Amino acid sequence: MIKWPWKNSQPQVQTLEHWQAAISIPLLAPLSDEERQKLVTLADQFLKQKRLIPLQELVLTEIMQQRIALLFSLPVLSLGIDALDGFHEVLVYPGPFIVEEEWQDDIGLVHTGKMVQSGQSWDQGPIVLNWQEVQDSFDLSGFNLIIHEVAHKLDIRSSGEATGVPLIPLRDIAVWEQHLHGAMDALQEEIDLVGEEAASMDPYAVHDPAECFAVLSEYFFSAPELLDERFPDLYRCFQKFYRQDPLARLKSWQSSVNYRAPSIY
């Protein structure tokens, strides 16, 4: 077995004080003190294992790097840092970026052209982000660019390609697919009825099962009450896979005497 020099089997415990400014965002406010400590330890490991590469003259300050690492670590809080082994680099643009892409239309014709992207997750390569929308991921709105791309990487770990079914026990796959496709069908019906702009959730979820898993993972962590209300069975599937219960965490925080959403700066 090869031992990579940057992998530390005994991660150092990071002090919350050093990460206090970075962790003070609404998305992470519901975490308990124990979860916060675990999260910053994972985030520190992340920064030691991955290269953050700013593009187009973007300057990544320490707090920017810490917040990127914290958001990458949140979905794997219980899965562990090894769940993020599928990449070594994170490329960060200042804003949405243009890429040359191929796509197939409804009748099978292949087209090539320039497309604006928010982020990308290559099957055997880096994750690409844009800082503008990373900043939009700090709240509890249901949108989270980093969690979306992490979900794709977790999906790919299962079979080598993104199918919408991450690494779960074989006995759970049929139920998972049933609820995932059920959510896609329900969202498509809603879109057909009220249109994409008025839909209750991001219409990109109906694109394919892989995108549905990624989009609804965003809601699982940043708007769990909406996912649980719309698709409670799927929420429980996600809860079992991620080994977290963001809704219970959110309710506990909201009922606490210290309930106060932090300001983002």
Swiss-Prot record:
InterPro entries reported for this sequence: MetalloPept_cat_dom_sf (IPR024079), MtfA_enterob (IPR057256), MtfA_fam (IPR010384), MtfA_N (IPR042252)
EC number(s) given by UniProt: 3.4.11.-
GO molecular function: aminopeptidase activity; metallopeptidase activity; zinc ion binding
Subcellular localization(s) per the UniProt record: Cytoplasm
BP-aspect Gene Ontology terms: proteolysis
GO CC annotations on file: cytosol
Gene3D superfamilies noted in UniProt: Collagenase (Catalytic Domain) (3.40.390.10), Glucose-regulated metallo-peptidase M90, N-terminal domain (1.10.472.150)
SUPFAM superfamilies: Metalloproteases ('zincins'), catalytic domain
Membrane-spanning ranges: none
Major site of localization recorded for this protein: cytoplasm
Keywords: Aminopeptidase, Cytoplasm, Hydrolase, Metal-binding, Metalloprotease, Protease, Zinc
Cofactor mode of binding and number, as noted: Binds 1 zinc ion per subunit.
Binding-site list for Zn(2+): H111, H148, H152, E211
One Pfam family in the UniProt entry: Peptidase_M90
Lineage top rank: taxon: Bacteria
Protein's UniProt keywords contain Nucleus: no
Cofactors demanded by this protein: Zn(2+)
Keyword Hydrolase: yes
Role summary: Involved in the modulation of the activity of the glucose-phosphotransferase system (glucose-PTS). Interacts with the transcriptional repressor Mlc, preventing its interaction with DNA and leading to the modulation of expression of genes regulated by Mlc, including ptsG, which encodes the PTS system glucose-specific EIICB component. Shows zinc-dependent metallopeptidase activity.
Annotated NCBIfam families: PRK15410.1
Family designation: Belongs to the MtfA family.
Oligomer and partners: Interacts with Mlc.
Protein name per its UniProtKB record: Mlc titration factor A
Organism in which the protein naturally occurs: Pectobacterium carotovorum subsp. carotovorum (strain PC1)
